[in-house]
Amino acid sequence: MPAHLLQEEISSSYTTTTTITAPPSRVLQNGGGKLEKTPLYLEEDIRPEMRDDIYDPNYQDKEGPKPKLEYVWRNIILMGLLHLGALYGITLIPTCKIYTFLWVLFYYVISALGITAGVHRLWSHRTYKARLPLRVFLIIANTMAFQNDVFEWSRDHRAHHKFSETDADPHNSRRGFFFSHVGWLLVRKHPAVREKGATLDLSDLRAEKLVMFQRRYYKPGVLLLCFILPTLVPWYLWGESFQNSLFFATFLRYAVVLNATWLVNSAAHMYGYRPYDKTINPRENILVSLGAVGEGFHNYHHTFPYDYSASEYRWHINFTTFFIDCMAAIGLAYDRKKVSKAAVLGRMKRTGEESYKSG
């Protein structure tokens, strides 16, 4: 039995998942309808949480000259130093203790989950609900990752979805690989990002005390959890050299987590296939999913941003979904939203690339 089918049988026995079903419609019956007349909220896409993370095809860039790039030299210098330190950390790998490797792997996975299961699937898209202990864990893990606080990350990500591949998209991939990967962090935001970002409903984030607490104490939290703790633990507990602890366990580990996330914005918007919606840039990219613990099924995710698995196949190359399901098994996660097979097939028939089909 295929792994994803076995997983579905197992998970259905111990948890409740909200399935987003496809109501009867002419679209599902014959795949008809012209794409340019497709409404903003498709019949198969309707769900109750929020709609500020759903692509708005009606938004277009304003005509006229583009604003001049304004470089943020502080970010350029810090990113340059970080990656120089990470490169030096690579040369130290042969001298590191085995416990340090295990520590780095542990810190990498926890940090990644703070992004994927935390700020992305929980807070940005509200694809599932989490009880307080899980939310506390994810807010700590997110701080360990140091990729902006939950409020700012979620705001930018909702803008990225709603205004994808336009000037209002913070990391618009139409501006090139480097810009969508890291360049967007090295320059001032395009005025359209600020203008359209201000129109998004962020009341759910402002109302959550844990999110605002993290935002208030983010800088000292990052200093402790992203830099001090991962350096001191191997140095103090098992006698790793301070040099290895700093450059390998901290700088290299942090740089790898950053680039794994950035590849979702760059590579997964340029390389891969589009079985769900060929009219948008995001693609299915297995290599990205491996590094980003399940975030590489990007054509599916941009088509169905409210699916907690961010993929049609749940556990397939998707450790984040496995983690969320484990949390559901012990009662810490609930109300996981999963798009029905009928809705997926209907969307593939109508907008997907013809050379691919649902597995």
Curated annotation (Swiss-Prot):
Residues binding substrate, per UniProt: N75, N148, R155, D156, R188, K189, W262
Positions of short motif Histidine box-2: 157-161
Motif stretch (Histidine box-1): 120-125
Major subcellular location class: endoplasmic reticulum
Reaction it catalyzes: octadecanoyl-CoA + 2 Fe(II)-[cytochrome b5] + O2 + 2 H(+) = (9Z)-octadecenoyl-CoA + 2 Fe(III)-[cytochrome b5] + 2 H2O
Localization annotation: Endoplasmic reticulum membrane
Official protein name in the record: Acyl-CoA desaturase
Disulfide bridges in this chain: none
Function noted in UniProt: Stearoyl-CoA desaturase that utilizes O(2) and electrons from reduced cytochrome b5 to introduce the first double bond into saturated fatty acyl-CoA substrates. Catalyzes the insertion of a cis double bond at the delta-9 position into fatty acyl-CoA substrates including palmitoyl-CoA and stearoyl-CoA. Gives rise to a mixture of 16:1 and 18:1 unsaturated fatty acids. Plays an important role in lipid biosynthesis. Plays an important role in regulating the expression of genes that are involved in lipogenesis and in regulating mitochondrial fatty acid oxidation.
Keyword Metal-binding: yes
Key words, A-Z: Endoplasmic reticulum, Fatty acid biosynthesis, Fatty acid metabolism, Iron, Lipid biosynthesis, Lipid metabolism, Membrane, Metal-binding, Oxidoreductase, Phosphoprotein, Transmembrane, Transmembrane helix
Residues involved in Fe cation 2 binding: H160, H269, H298, H302
Species in which this protein is naturally found: Ovis aries (Sheep)
Example GO molecular function: oxidoreductase activity
Residue ranges crossing the lipid bilayer per the database entry: 73-93, 98-118, 218-237, 242-263
Sequence ranges on the Lumenal membrane side: 94-97, 238-241
Keyword Transmembrane helix among record annotations: yes
Cofactor: Fe(2+)
E.C. designation(s): 1.14.19.1
Residue positions binding Fe cation 1: H120, H125, H157, H161, H301
Residue numbers of Phosphoserine PTMs: S203
InterPro entries on file: Acyl-CoA_DS, FADS-1_CS
Topology in membrane: Multi-pass membrane protein
